[in-house]
From Swiss-Prot:
EC nos: 7.1.1.-
Catalyzed reaction equations: a plastoquinone + NADH + (n+1) H(+)(in) = a plastoquinol + NAD(+) + n H(+)(out); a plastoquinone + NADPH + (n+1) H(+)(in) = a plastoquinol + NADP(+) + n H(+)(out)
Principal location listed in the UniProt entry: membrane
Any one cellular-component term (Gene Ontology): plasma membrane-derived thylakoid membrane
Function of the protein: NDH-1 shuttles electrons from NAD(P)H, via FMN and iron-sulfur (Fe-S) centers, to quinones in the respiratory chain. The immediate electron acceptor for the enzyme in this species is believed to be plastoquinone. Couples the redox reaction to proton translocation (for every two electrons transferred, four hydrogen ions are translocated across the cytoplasmic membrane), and thus conserves the redox energy in a proton gradient.
Highest taxon above the source species: Bacteria
Family from the record: Belongs to the complex I subunit 4 family.
InterPro entries: NADH_Q_OxRdtase_chain4 (IPR022997), NADH_Q_OxRdtase_chainM/4 (IPR010227), NADH_UbQ_OxRdtase (IPR003918), ND/Mrp_TM (IPR001750)
HAMAP family from the UniProt entry: NDH1_NuoM
Membrane topology category: Multi-pass membrane protein
Protein name, UniProt field: NAD(P)H-quinone oxidoreductase chain 4 1
UniProt KW keywords: Membrane, NAD, NADP, Plastoquinone, Quinone, Thylakoid, Translocase, Transmembrane, Transmembrane helix
Membrane-crossing residue ranges in chain numbering: 6-26, 36-56, 91-111, 115-135, 136-156, 169-189, 212-232, 243-263, 277-297, 314-334, 335-355, 375-397, 417-437, 464-484
GN (gene name): ndhD1
Length: 525
């Protein structure tokens, strides 16, 4: 059967969205039918993603594949244009995997199940669209549409301060989206031909000052979603009030949208401006790693502690992105996927712990490991993955960023030594706050008041299955990272070469900018 011309990406995007529209008419009294329906739809869509990937995707091809383009507004060159390359394909697979598991994690949800699973499936298709669309205006639209399900998931099913957290989320992200719209319209109408096609936009000859302005606009929008300090404060509040499945989607997928867009738009379309902004990004990445790690250490609320840990880990993505090496950029992509798996697992376990203890304050926990040995073991394993234990995906990703940046010829030796030292400090801080967290939850003397009022039952099979599904790729990638890196190596090599080609212009026009040896080989070639 020839599947090369089948509209895989359109089908994968529209299937969960169309399925969500049927939820209001499905007969169901107690929510059980709806949740099984949502799970089956998620599994079918994920199976289609995997099948399309294995039958129609070529690892060695760095360009867009599975390309589809259907006219929408021909006068403005607006098209339903989708495609996948090495940058987007791993994140599409991650989206299908995490969202399907989040559907299973949502099993205990009983409040308005029809609306909940409607939002979950609609969000599923929308998130895949963000990683697949190749039309900039269409990208803006699906980026904006993603805000609605997340807002409602926070505002309806969140904790006591859910309205505050949801409002803060929508204000931050919608405000950032204005910069995307302004930049998109400006780029589209620049020059003689009007177009929103990303590939055509990348070929336009923008003046350097114009590139810098566009880059800054995109950076603000994507820095909010990644997030980059100081535009991060919405995330701890959102995580502090979210339910377990919303946690998994926030940590596992939503943050990756910011990292993906930063690489796709800022580096892919505006490489000359990237050469100017790269040193600033490195500094911001270091601030993310150190500041968020120290803040996480000080948190007494379990959800907020893990939220700041996520911000810290995103610092490695930023530094790898700005390294000008194949290895660093490859590590940044690997870190996004790795953190998606690890972050989803930790927040799921935080939810499982809260369901039993009914508290998030570490001061009110203690000694529960004896009563919940399975949750204790799973929490420990996922925490080890988060602190980058060798043999797990986080170790490989952070090591690649370390080596990629350290071997970069785009920065002075002094600057590299300082940055690598501070990155190492962040790596040391991570086990300090994670191991202390485990000690306060599971070790020590039991909180007698907690034990007397709560039934501390251990993990049920559904919870063990979700964590097992997440740990398998975490460990698999840790021992054999080529499982993942082979998907995108060709794309990252091509993108890094384009970024390095832009640096001679920088060196000529601005001598004080980071030095680059034009004759030096690109790392990984």
């Amino acid at each position: 059967m020839n599947t090369a011309n089948f509209p895989w990406l359109t089908t994968i995007i529209l299937l969960p969205i169309a399925a969500s529209l049927l939820i209001p008419i499905i007969p169901d009294k107690d929510g059980k039918t709806i949740r099984w329906y949502a799970l089956i739809v998620g599994l079918i869509d994920f199976a289609l993603i995997v099948y399309a990937f294995y039958t129609s995707y070529d690892f060695a091809n760095p360009d867009l594949q599975l390309v589809e383009s259907y006219p929408w507004v021909p006068q403005l060159d607006l098209n339903w244009s989708v495609g996948a390359d090495g940058l987007s394909m791993p994140l599409i697979i991650l989206t299908g995997f995490i969202t399907t598991l989040a559907t299973l994690a949502a099993w205990p949800v009983t409040l308005k199940p029809r609306l909940f699973y409607f939002l979950l499936l609609a969000m599923y298709g929308g998130q895949i669209a963000v990683f697949a669309v190749q039309d900039l205006l269409l990208f803006f639209l699906v980026w904006e549409l993603e805000l609605i399900p997340v807002y409602l998931l926070l505002a309806i099913w969140g904790g006591k301060k859910r309205q505050y957290a949801a409002t803060k989320f929508i204000l931050y992200t919608a405000g950032g989206s204005l910069f995307i719209l302004l930049a998109a319209l400006t780029m589209a109408f620049y020059g003689d031909n009007v177009t929103f096609d990303m590939r055509s936009l990348a070929l336009k000859d923008y003046a350097l000052n114009f590139q810098l302005l566009l880059y800054a606009g995109f950076l603000i929008a994507y820095a909010i979603k990644l997030p980059i300090i100081p535009l991060h404060t919405w995330l701890p509040d959102a995580h502090g009030e979210a339910t377990a499945p919303a946690h998994m989607l926030l940590a596992g997928i939503l943050l990756k949208m910011g990292g993906y867009a930063l690489i796709r738009m800022n580096a892919g379309i505006l490489p000359d401006a990237h050469a100017y902004f790269a040193p600033v990004l490195v500094v911001l990445g270091v601030v993310n790693i150190i500041y968020a790690a120290l803040t996480s250490f000080a948190q007494r609320n379990l959800k907020r502690k893990i939220a700041y840990s996520s911000i810290s880990h995103m610092g490695f993505v930023i530094i790898g992105f700005a390294s000008f090496t194949d290895l660093g950029l490859s590590g940044a992509v690997l870190q996004m996927v790795s953190h998606g798996l690890i972050g989803a697992s930790l927040f799921f376990l935080v939810g499982a712990t809260y369901d039993r203890t009914h508290t998030l304050m570490l001061d009110e926990m203690g000694g529960v490991g004896k009563r919940m040995p399975k949750i204790f073991a799973m929490f420990t394993a996922c925490s080890m993955a988060s602190l980058a234990l060798p043999g797990m995906s986080g170790f490989v990703a952070e090591l690649m960023v370390f080596v990629g940046f350290a071997t970069s010829d785009a920065y002075s030796s002094t600057f590299k030594v300082i940055v690598v030292f501070l990155m190492a400090v962040g790596v040391i801080l991570t086990p300090i706050y994670l191991l202390s967290m485990l000690r306060e939850i599971f070790y020590g003397k039991e909180n007698e008041e907690l034990v007397s009022h709560q039934q501390l039952i251990d993990a049920e099979p559904r919870e063990v299955f979700v964590i097992a599904c997440l740990l398998v790729p975490i460990i698999g990638i840790g021992f054999y990272p080529k499982l993942l890196t082979q998907m995108y190596d060709a794309t990252t090599v091509q993108l890094t070469a384009r970024l390095r080609d832009s640096v001679p212009t920088l060196a000529q026009e601005k001598p004080e900018a980071p030095k680059v040896s034009l004759s030096a080989p690109v790392i990984g070639n």
